[in-house]
Design a protein with these regions (language model features):
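Short, aromatic/His-centered strand-loop micro-motif at the edge of beta-sheets
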Residues: 96-119
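Peripheral membrane interaction modules
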Residues: 1, 139-143, 164-167
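Surface-exposed coil/turn segments at beta-strand junctions on protein surfaces, enriched
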Residues: 44-46, 111-115, 124, 147
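Extracellular glycan-recognition surfaces and repeat-rich motifs
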Residues: 1-24
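Flexible glycan-contacting loops in extracellular carbohydrate-active proteins
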Residues: 141-162
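Carbohydrate-binding surfaces in secreted/extracellular proteins
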Residues: 53, 114-141
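Conserved N-terminal substructure of TIR/SEFIR domains
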Residues: 158-205
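Secretory/extracellular carbohydrate-interaction modules
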Residues: 22-98, 170-174
């Protein structure tokens, strides 16, 4: 379980083995009261690979949702999130840029279950996003852009608490491609310079 978290907005409690989003009711400006929202960011960086978590809703009423943020921009607060319950669907992939943009939605929100431990895994390869829930591929879509490396986290909305365990990031290292002859002095250049620089920058080469 990733240990270091902060709240951009919303309330959460971090315990030894789990993170708890504190649901409730919140007053929104110029609108009716609604379900509490939280944007939680951790210290893990991601630009491809897999992010997994175990998500449990303690109660479910629309618009209960918990999504893994696979991209977060700290300047604009824009993000891309994939998971459970977004925009009234059971499974969701969407982005927020001052408004919601839905990339792929499937399933009915009413089928989400209370106190069920959902094992959620999001995989990103280039612009392709795949969502697995309990080892079943439930959603796959291509974003209209490639996401840069960023810190990741959770987006939650609910009138009740949501528990998240085993939040794990398995980042795929970016790849550097080198075109050169396999002969001296290029072999020495590769070993002494190129490979060392790529190792320092955490790149596969």
């Amino acid at each position: 379980m990733t240990k270091n978290w902060t709240s951009i907005f919303g309330e959460f409690k971090l315990e030894e083995e789990e993170l708890i989003f504190k649901g409730g009711t919140v007053e929104f400006k110029d609108s009716e009261p609604g379900a509490s929202i939280a944007n939680l960011v951790c210290d893990e960086y991601y630009g491809g690979g897999k992010i997994s978590a175990e998500i449990t809703f303690k109660d479910i009423t629309f618009p209960s949702a918990c999504e893994i943020m696979i991209y977060f921009d700290p300047t604009t607060k824009n993000f891309v999130s994939v998971g459970l319950g977004g925009s009234g669907a059971m499974y969701s992939a969407r982005s927020f840029t001052n408004k919601w943009i839905e990339h792929s939605m499937t399933g009915e929100h009413k089928n989400l279950e209370v106190n069920k431990d959902y094992n959620v895994e999001v995989e990103m390869k280039g612009s392709q996003i795949t969502l697995k829930v309990d080892n079943i591929v439930v959603l796959s879509t291509n974003l209209p852009y490639n996401l840069p490396i960023s810190q990741v986290g959770l987006w939650c909305q609910s009138y009740s608490d949501i528990h998240v365990k085993n939040f794990t990031v398995k980042r795929e290292k970016p790849k550097a491609f080198v075109v050169m002859q396999f002969s001296s002095p290029y072999n020495e250049l590769y070993e002494d310079v190129i490979k060392k620089v790529c190792d320092e920058q955490d790149l596969n080469v």
